[in-house]
Amino acid sequence: MATYVEIDDAADPRLADYRDLRDVQLRQSLEAEHGLFLAEGEKVVRRAAEAGFPVRSFLMAPRWLAGLADVLDGSEAPCFVVSEALAEQVTGFHVHRGALASLARTPLPTVEEVLDGARTVVVCEDIVDHTN
């Protein structure tokens, strides 16, 4: 079960994974350097956790806890509970989907594994911001 940690200081170092997310270059550097990615919104957080990605932590306002209670119950990661104003201050944007999670990337499959049995393969080059 996740440990619930109430935080009221935007400078708390435990929130580092979520800091200044509007800066695409900073986010991409952080994600690549630390092998993590962020999920935003109840559905995406749920799907990422259910897909087996190791959860580093959760960040959410109190009103979103109930909707993800089953996911939190199945995780050992800390859940940082913050006000919506503090979430916006930390991330740099209004967290309108209510919940964020920091997850560890799993190793990528080899080219051979991707192509094995594939009928169609799509290659997308020069993607600057994968969220778009």
Task: Describe these PLM feature segments.
Residues 101:
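Glycine-rich phosphate-binding loops that contact phosphosugars or nucleotide phosphates
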Residues 47, 67-68, 89, 132:
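Phosphate- and divalent-cation-binding pockets in alpha/beta enzyme and binding domains
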Residues 73-92:
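A glycine-rich helix N-cap at a beta->alpha junction
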Residues 29-31, 92-94, 113-117:
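Solvent-exposed alpha-helices and their adjacent loops that cap or buttress functional pockets
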Residues 2-5, 43, 50, 106-108, ...:
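RNA substrate-binding interface of SAM-dependent RNA methyltransferases
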Residues 1-67:
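Boundary-proximal intrinsically disordered activation/regulatory segments immediately upstream
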Residues 54, 77, 97, 117-119:
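Short coil/turn connectors at secondary-structure junctions
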Residues 67-75, 112:
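Short loop/helix-cap segments at secondary-structure boundaries that form the rim of catalytic
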